[in-house]
Each structure stands twice: as C-alpha cells, then as structure tokens.
Amino acid sequence: MIIFYGLFSILVLTSINIAEAGHHNRVNCLLPPKTGPCKGSFARYYFDIETGSCKAFIYGGCEGNSNNFSEKHHCEKRCRGFRKFGGK
C-alpha cells in the first residue's frame, strides 16, 4: 500500500510540473512581436493577442523574444485559443 501511495504521489507531482511547463510556454504568446536590433531579414510569425491569430513579421536575427515562430503552424499549435480579455 505504501508503494501505491508513493507512485501515486510521483504521478501527481509530475502532472503538475507538466501542466505548469505548458502554461509557461503559452504565456510567450502574450508577448508583443520583437524584431530586435540586428539587420537580418527573417520571415517569422508571432501570435497577435488582439486578433487571436498568427501573423507574419520580419525578425532581425537577435534579441527577439519567445513569441517568434519559423512556421505559422507552429505558432498556431502553441498559441491556439488565446484571446485578450474583453476581445471581440
């Protein structure tokens, strides 16, 4: 019985950590797009909280943030379902 409770506790703690990690990753969807100071010109996608959709932007190549995806479907997969409170 002690083994059962031990395994159950491990399962619960692991589930909590996984849920928190997923939430942390999705918080990146709230960041504004950041081109950065470098002079590169990379086509990227960011999640626009106002519209609830992923949009294209040009990334300079350095000092961006985590709301920066190389492909639109990656952006959509990560940020799907986010909307600004009070949004239409």
UniProtKB/Swiss-Prot annotation:
A Gene Ontology BP annotation from the UniProt entry: envenomation resulting in negative regulation of voltage-gated potassium channel activity in another organism
Site feature: Reactive bond for trypsin: K39, G40
Listed PROSITE patterns: BPTI_KUNITZ_1 (PS00280), BPTI_KUNITZ_2 (PS50279)
Chief location category: secreted
Residues carrying sugar: N68
InterPro entries assigned: Kunitz_BPTI, Kunitz_BPTI_sf, Prtase_inh_Kunz-CS, TFPI/VKTCI-like
Consequence when changing R78A: 49-fold reduction in KCNA3 inhibition
Site positions per UniProt: Pore-blocking residue: K77
Tissue specificity statement from the Swiss-Prot or TrEMBL entry: Expressed by the venom gland.
GO molecular function terms noted in the UniProt entry: potassium channel regulator activity; serine-type endopeptidase inhibitor activity; toxin activity
PANTHER family cross-referenced by the UniProt entry: BPTI_KUNITZ INHIBITOR DOMAIN-CONTAINING PROTEIN, KUNITZ-TYPE PROTEASE INHIBITOR-RELATED
Additional remark text: Negative results: has no effect on chymotrypsin, nor elastase, nor the KCa1.1/KCNMA1 potassium channel. Shows weak inhibitory activity against mKv1.1/KCNA1 (1 uM inhibits less than 50% of currents), hKv1.2/KCNA2 (1 uM inhibits less than 50% of currents), and hKCa2.3/KCNN3.
Role noted for this protein: Dual-function toxin that inhibits trypsin at a molar ratio of 1:1 (Ki=107 nM) and inhibits mKv1.3/KCNA3 potassium channels (IC(50)=6.2 nM, and inhibits 80% of currents at 1 uM).
Name the UniProt record assigns to this protein: Kunitz-type serine protease inhibitor Hg1
